[in-house]
Swiss-Prot record:
One family name in Pfam for this protein: Pribosyltran
Annotated binding of Mg(2+), by residue: D89
Protein's recorded name: Xanthine-guanine phosphoribosyltransferase
Subcellular location: Cell inner membrane
Protein task: Purine salvage pathway enzyme that catalyzes the transfer of the ribosyl-5-phosphate group from 5-phospho-alpha-D-ribose 1-diphosphate (PRPP) to the N9 position of the 6-oxopurines guanine and xanthine to form the corresponding ribonucleotides GMP (guanosine 5'-monophosphate) and XMP (xanthosine 5'-monophosphate), with the release of PPi. To a lesser extent, also acts on hypoxanthine.
Record field: catalytic activity: GMP + diphosphate = guanine + 5-phospho-alpha-D-ribose 1-diphosphate; XMP + diphosphate = xanthine + 5-phospho-alpha-D-ribose 1-diphosphate; IMP + diphosphate = hypoxanthine + 5-phospho-alpha-D-ribose 1-diphosphate
Keyword annotations of the record: Cell inner membrane, Cell membrane, Glycosyltransferase, Magnesium, Membrane, Metal-binding, Purine salvage, Transferase
Positions annotated to bind 5-phospho-alpha-D-ribose 1-diphosphate: R37, G38, D88, D89, L90, V91, D92, T93, G94, N95, T96
Entry similarity comment: Belongs to the purine/pyrimidine phosphoribosyltransferase family. XGPT subfamily.
InterPro entries found in the cross-reference section: PRibTrfase_dom (IPR000836), PRTase-like (IPR029057), Xanthine_Guanine_PRibTrfase (IPR023747)
Gene3D superfamilies membership: 3.40.50.2020
GO cellular component: cytosol; plasma membrane
One Gene Ontology biological process: GMP salvage
């Protein structure tokens, strides 16, 4: 990936709330299926904003920090997805999204961020990201000392 897009907690929360607005009225939903791990964060925001208490997970391993590998389903919610929102932080190449679509064909699949290759596979998202851009999510970052410019 040649570019990086750094997301702060404030930005993420704002975008996740915007996604929640698009999912109203809340009465149409039975619950949320969060794609672990990136989808756990927007799932918490959606659950709060939509007043939903039923939150399931689907655990699919595909990344090792910035390298995408083979998909491995570790755990899946036992439903066809009817009445459920499936949420992930990002749709990138679409590999994970295709697997999720097969598992939950009746769910509404949403993400906060979408890259061009994966965007057609989700029902809704908030922010377009160029395909060659790596997203640094706030849960992957820490706060550290930065030396003054004069010391570099």
């Amino acid at each position: 990936m040649s570019e990086k897009y750094v997301v702060t907690w404030d930005m993420f929360h704002m975008h996740a709330r915007k996604l929640a607005e698009r999912l109203l009225p809340a009465s149409q939903w039975k619950g949320i299926i969060a794609v672990s791990r990136g989808g756990l964060f927007p799932a918490a925001v959606l659950a709060r904003e939509l007043g939903l208490r039923h939150v399931e997970t689907v655990c699919i391993a595909s990344y090792d920090h910035d390298q995408q590998g083979d998909l491995k389903v570790i755990h899946k919610a036992e439903t066809d997805g009817e009445g459920f929102i499936v949420v992930d932080d990002l749709v990138d190449t679409g590999n994970t999204a295709r697997e999720i679509r097969n598992m939950y064909p009746k769910a509404k699949f949403v993400t906060v961020f979408a890259k061009p290759a994966g965007a057609p596979l989700v029902d809704d998202y908030v922010i377009d990201i160029p395909q060659n851009t790596w997203i640094e999510q706030p849960w992957d970052l820490g706060i550290g000392f930065v030396p003054p410019l004069a010391r570099k």
